[in-house]
Amino acid sequence: MEKMSYTFSQQYEEKIRPCIDTIDNLRSLGVEKDLALPAIAVIGDQSSGKSSVLEALSGVPLPRGSGIVTRCPLELKMIRSKEDEKWHGRISYQNHEEDFDDPAEVEKKIREAQDEMAGAGVGISEELISLQITSANVPDLTLIDLPGIARVAVKGQPENIGDQIKRLIRMFITKQETINLVVVPCNVDIATTEALQMAQAEDPEGERTLGILTKPDLVDKGTEGTVVDIVHNEVIHLTKGYMIVRCRGQKEIMDQVTLNEATETESAFFKDHPHFRKLYEEGFATIPKLAEKLTIELVHHIQRSLPRLEDQIQTKLAETQKELEAYGDGPPSDPAERLSFFIDKVTAFTCDTLNLTTGEEVKSASKLLIFPELRQEFAYWNSFLDSSGYSFKLKIEEEVDNYEVKYRGRELPGFINYKTFEGLVREQMKLLEEPALKMLKNVSDMVKKKFIQLAQSSFTGFPILLKIAKTKIEAIKQDKECLAESMLRTQFKMELIVYTQDGTYSQSLLRSKEKREEDEEDTENFDCMTVGIATSNHATLSEMKLHLESYYMIASQRLADQIPMVIRYLLLQEAALELQRSMLQLLQDKDGVDDMLKEDFDIGQKRENLLSRQKRLMKAQNLLATY
């Protein structure tokens, strides 16, 4: 192939290769699995001339034929060597890597790789094939060739082959790091080409899209001006603009016209063409000019992307480290080390359990908290007691007219019957028991849920150990809940005994009377309600109400504290201690350590993947540091 004429200065050329090599090396490390890398993706409809453009750039024959020829993404890595160095090729895919020295073998090697990756036939694969070409006759450039867009499935292809190809193309062109190289024949309406429509959908402003017009020799007479307008960016605007090239046609290939001869023919075509000569003179035409344009675009794109790429690697490394910490180190193979590992695991879990129930930091799950929800439950209980007291007050007021029938015994008017007082208090206390037991159940379920979440974070990947912990948590939950329920029921039985210290009751009664007097100062009926208290049933009821409110205030305050204390003591403190004792007993079963440390295969695989990601990201970080 005739050596392409480059206008790069030597100083600029010295910067090009290291810049492109940096990204190529990152891609070879597999970093593209984790981050999007700067790239140029080549897309086009079938028969757009895409393969011819790539052949002309690389100087080697690529797979040709009807239907889908490119069946896997092909990374075409071109490295410009010194004049005296021989042509060299290297193809790599999956775990296969092969060097060869004959450019004529390229097509065969690619077909073999595609058959291996996508199966023999016409299927496609998302797996990348990497082809590296080192030659004095190629530009310093890396392109990713994607399958041509098919509209109709041919024999042997699935009906949705078109959708499969578009999905594969979108995987690349949606990334902000990708420059979209759209190949469009000159002899079709550019606005209707699917490749350009796809590029516009993902890059509406055309900031990442470069148009390549092919087959200028097939343009109908009279339409040349339209082609010139397109290249001048006057029809469909793209920020990166357009280039136009003429590659070998099918007849020239059949006539065995070499790529050397095709390059000379292309140059002559544009120089002599009455309409396209202007494009040649302006630097918008020929493969060598396209190569220069692409190299400059890629280098600038890489230079703009590198700072952001470094930040992304830092972020991804931090995320990976955090995930690895969540999965732990995995059990060692040495028996003594396995036992130590097991002891550490169980001990850490029990310590975290105690920390969780005392409000301290939980190491294995820093965001796991129990007290916010617990305080919410207890606050709701306190609020319920207040609202229940208000309902109690309304209930007494509503029953004023029925007092004589319901509550008054043989006493004369003006006397307060203590049994009546006790009866009303007991009736009210009974109404509070079921809500308290409901709160107990809510807290018990919540504590169990938190303990299980803690076990899951502590024993990630160890299903047997996790199952043992869950079983113990459930058993302890039932035991402590049953005990707490018994204590609460006993508490409410005791509440049926109306009792408090005399001084406590006197103070409460005094506060209630003072509040009553303040509330009634502005009431018109105040005088009639307070005169003749010894002979007025309403005054007696008012006095009864005062005593009931005073006592309920004391009892509700007692329950507001006592019920949460019982629940917290048994369901948190005692449950955590019992779980600690029960889990530590496992340490005595040294023969069962191997079974309990049997790791979930998926977790082990995930850890390996994370370690692999961490390794390649660290290599990538070092690579960028030396750029």
UniProtKB/Swiss-Prot annotation:
Residues 44-51 are annotated as: G1 motif. InterPro entries: Dynamin, Dynamin_GTPase, Dynamin_GTPase_CS, Dynamin_N, Dynamin_stalk, G_DYNAMIN_dom, GED, GED_dom. Residues 69-71 are annotated as: G2 motif. Residues 541-627 form the GED domain. It is found in: Cytoplasm. Keywords: Cytoplasm, GTP-binding, Nucleotide-binding. Residues 214-217 are annotated as: G4 motif. Gene3D superfamilies: Dynamin, middle domain, P-loop containing nucleotide triphosphate hydrolases. GO terms for cellular component: cytoplasm; microtubule; nucleus; plasma membrane; presynapse; synapse. Residues 145-148 are annotated as: G3 motif. The keyword Ion transport does not apply. Belongs to the TRAFAC class dynamin-like GTPase superfamily. Dynamin/Fzo/YdjA family. This is Interferon-induced GTP-binding protein MxB. The gene is mxb.
